[in-house]
Amino acid sequence: MRKQVNKGYNKKIETEDQALPGETFISSLEVDHIVSMDKIASMDGFGDLTKKQQLELLNNPENFTGLSKSANTSKQSKSYEKWTHYKKGTPDEIEVSPDFRSKMITREKQLERILQKQIEDFNKE
């Protein structure tokens, strides 16, 4: 997945962080689940899947994006709706880019429907 999220990305040049306004980084992007693993594991029917099906669902390539190390560490397993600030409650607090969040919240909701359908389809097999 790391290769997928870094395709066409130059890790050797300073890059503006798309999620954290004013921040830059020089490194590879980290892999982040758009819909968290915790959320997927709690979806209706997930527990009825075989381990192989669960892994296939958790590794659905559509459900990954690349984030800077700082952004990924800050977000953890929060939804994009709940992830509002980097270093929240500190003097260095930064609001996550509203445009980025809005785009990712929309994508997250789309993926929740896609993943739920994938679960339902697996359970029909």
Please name every model-derived segment:
Residues 54, 58-125:
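Catalytic cores of phosphodiester-bond-cleaving enzymes
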Residues 1-81:
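Betabetaalpha-Me/HNH-type nuclease active-site subdomain
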